């Protein structure tokens, strides 16, 4: 059974991100149907293997058997699936809730597919050294295509037949830029942490190159979600890896290399006479800003600590450094919260520019995500008690926005409408209710907590934890859909698989 799961996971991280049939015209449905086919083949193959070997004991199986209790992560996805069923049954748009046709196809059928593959992968997958390398190589290809397209180089001719005004909306073999950013927040953390933990030089080279290229893709995709997820990732990694001097030195080195690739992009832009699709505020600072001092400090300090830890045999970082970094992180977070509250509730008149705009929440915040979030809360407050508990129907947020007149308001405000909240958690709060949203959060948070605990005995668990954290944070400003969510479910399933291994 383990071999079947390995093949499925390998295809999900190689074939799936690269597959598209007709450029960007049907890309969401291409990925949707590809996932359905792969999931169906997994179920069929697993069923055949079970029928053949059901009476044979797998002596190599170290995974807890079915007599063991479900984990909190299991209960989370079970509750989420149950809420999706109830939501569909009580919805005014039952068929659309089933298919997700009113939104991004994240309907009950797709949620059922998530549910099935999660339990298959979490129970049958066996660790394989080839899978992460395949993931790293594929993600590098996907990200590199995106970097080239940022400068109007289109190696796969994906923009053929599109107007130039649409170029800025789509990128690489993933599609929409926000979805591309979500993909990168899954794979970049995997490559980055694998670089930190790998002992063999060839693995460090592969994962290091992949981490750098995928970070370059994040810089070029111009999406708030990927920047938010990356900030959360780095905060987590610096706090987690500070305890081990060797790991911390590797983190400093990969940080410097990621900053260096921003300068490589800068010089490439110079060669191209700055003929690009442009960079947002934070990305522009990374590319064009004077970050050479930071690069030098992180690189030199990382190399010094790496050599020092090997020569002196010191593995633990001095406690004063650990506590100082944690204190600095808390201080910066507190200052950020203070600035956000001050410019949102007290000083609402001062003009804010660049990245400072994120510290004032209003209808225009985050490409008018503020408008959608505020109306999303209004929707939740106005539906009946049953809908508060179980939602209005899977992926029906946009239709409810229309029914309550909020899409008309959005059209008057920004000359467009929306079919999603652009916040995974708020979207689920409306569509599958309190029960579904809390179940989903339980599914994610419990996997992270258990993964961190498990990493004390198996450091490689933190590779998957980093990916889950990064994607979950970017989800605050993004949406679930059939392009990246299946990959995220696979990551959580792999983490659950590791969490269930007996000590």
PLM regions: where:
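Interfacial juxtamembrane loops and adjacent helix segments
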Residues: 149-174, 349-367, 374, 383-430
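Alpha-helical transmembrane segments of multi-pass inner-membrane proteins
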Residues: 4-22, 37-50, 78-91, 107-120, ...
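Non-cytosolic membrane-interface motifs at loop->transmembrane helix junctions
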Residues: 31, 98-107
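Membrane-interfacial loop-to-helix junctions in multi-pass inner-membrane proteins
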Residues: 64-74, 126-136
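Transmembrane alpha-helix boundary signature
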Residues: 47-67, 87-99, 154
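Membrane-interface helix caps and helix-loop-helix hairpins in membrane proteins
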Residues: 96-101, 219-224, 475-481
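Membrane-interfacial, low-structure loops and terminal tails that flank and connect transmembrane helices
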Residues: 55-70, 277-280, 308-324
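Short, hydrophobic transmembrane alpha-helix segments
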Residues: 19-32
